[in-house]
Amino acid sequence: LRYNGCALPRRANTFVDVLSAGGYRTASIGKSHLQPFTEKEPLGNKDTKERLISEAWKSDENPYIAEQPSTYEDGKGVEFESPYYGFQHVDMVTGHGYACGGHYGQWFRKKYPNWKELHDRKNELPNNYSCPQSFRTPIPEEAYPTAWIGDRAVDYINDSAKQDAPFFAFVSFPDPHHPFNPPGKYWDMYSPDEFSVDLPYSAHKNPTPAMQDVNRMWEAGESGAIPQMAFRASDEHVKETMALTAGMITMIDDQVGRLIQSLKDNGQYDNTVIVFTSDHGDYLGDFNMLLKGPLKLGSITRVPMIWSDPNSRTAVRTKTLGSTIDLSASILERAGFEPYNGMQGKSFLRSLSGDEPHRDEVLIEFNNNDARMGMVTVPRVRTLRSKSWRLSVYADEDWGELYDLENDPNETHNLWNDEKAEKAKLKLSLRLVEHLARQTDSSPRSKRLA
């Protein structure tokens, strides 16, 4: 999955396939996004040239429609090719916010015959917020996607207690995400006055061209071509967004609490590993920006990671670096299974005590299918993050990023063109190349000498 709009080929193995082959019952409950969940054409990615053959790879003839909206229209039944990337059971949620689709959307339309009215922004509940993409939804808390996912996950846990086989459940909440629309009491659970903009745009000593473009659009009153594009916001709007995001997070916390209580009620808590993490962050006010984009600020790449293990529920915090791709190898090791050839992550189990480092550096890759934030080409970004530095290289751009995290943890002074940082830049660039070389696929393994 190089970027949004691609589907993970069905011929790809996943660590969930390994768990399933090892006797685990497997479930995906909530957002999957292993296939496209809109039917819109991408921006700026149209090939206007006449070609005899259009792509380097032949199509595998799979339509990849398991997550697109039309698949779930009119309440029709959806039969997944089972298993779905290793998941034997699927409760699908697509999209974000109050108007999610998939199995949830089918349930919502059946449960609430007035669903169109509940989704109509003209019926927004009264409120004093004006930040972009905020919406006080009239949907009841118990019918919001976060609660529905919690309900389905509790049902799955209860059913698993009756089975002999162990289970793996991927419970994925679309929130926190724009649109910013926590339901019910979660809307005004937090006040914007509880938050502050600690990194205003003026805090950056030499804003990158991408940041300058976001600022230019804000000053000109322009908006992005699509709602997903990062934008600059006023301090007031940033604080409103923070408050609404906190409401969405608290609602998820409450659902996680329900899952843990269900495990305890069923006598499974002392035999279940619980992993809590996220796919990425949000600028959420850093330099007055909201949403996300090619700039790999810490607010985007630093995510929560909790590994709660029945072998030791003692809280230990480690400062070692890790990567999302390490989750698969770690889960397989904990389950007692060997990873397949070609898995790029490495297990971090031995670092959980806090004494043994896991990684000294992390490679972060970002591709997009349309140009954003004033970039001249479609973003292809490669970042190396160590405890002391962050280096980001932007293909086909005449600028990059280099931050001394020991002396500038908030990334306010870009040293890319600083002669005093040339030695560090060269060393990090070499290390980045080594990481990229290491990423070369080793699967499939050769079956002949030559």
What are these model-derived regions, one by one?
Residues 441-450:
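Short, charged, surface-exposed hinge/linker loops at domain edges
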Residues 1-394, 399-400, 410-430, 444:
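Formylglycine-dependent sulfatase
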Residues 435-441:
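Mixed-charge, Lys/Arg-enriched low-complexity segments
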